[in-house]
């Protein structure tokens, strides 16, 4: 989730279709994601949908037995022309629905710090967030997230590397 110059308001949206090969998965997942920057920060969302309802078997070790999961976040930055320009306030919602088990809604609030090279081809955003998960006890209600993007790796136009890593704590019991 990066703050880029707001000279233009553009949205980047893409859809991806994956086949999960793991012995405990073997199904198709569709991911739709969108990133949009504006003069007050940026908005990001994604929706994952697993197409495996026809393979439902409650006795199987299948880790995601059909369902939809989404995250939507907003980074707010009203001080882009100040020494605090790399810092933003962050709010986020996570949730989903499946046939056999609940995905508890979660709200996250906190700050993020954005770094980039001069060309904006290489970016890194670090987030420290308070995370509250519905119907869940949490000893440490925090989430730390890193989001990165690298364009034209090794000088090869179009070769990109992007991703994220989330770290959080949650006490829970899953019953199927």
Model-derived features with residue positions:
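Short loop/turn motifs that connect adjacent beta-strands in outer-membrane beta-barrel proteins
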Residues: 8-12, 37-44, 77-88, 116-124, ...
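Short glycine/proline- and aromatic-enriched beta-strand/turn motifs that initiate or cap beta-hairpins
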Residues: 9-55
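Residues that define the transmembrane beta-barrel architecture of outer-membrane proteins
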Residues: 11, 26-30, 64-70, 103-109, ...
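Transmembrane beta-barrel strands of outer-membrane/channel proteins
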Residues: 17-19, 45-49, 89-95, 124-130, ...
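Gram-negative outer-membrane beta-barrel proteins
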Residues: 21-23, 53-57, 80, 95-101, ...
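Residues on the lipid-exposed face of transmembrane beta-strands in outer-membrane beta-barrel proteins
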Residues: 32-36, 72-78, 109-115, 128, ...
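Hydrophobic/aromatic-rich structural module bridging two neighboring secondary-structure elements via a short loop
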Residues: 59-111
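Outer-membrane beta-barrel transmembrane domain signature
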Residues: 129-176
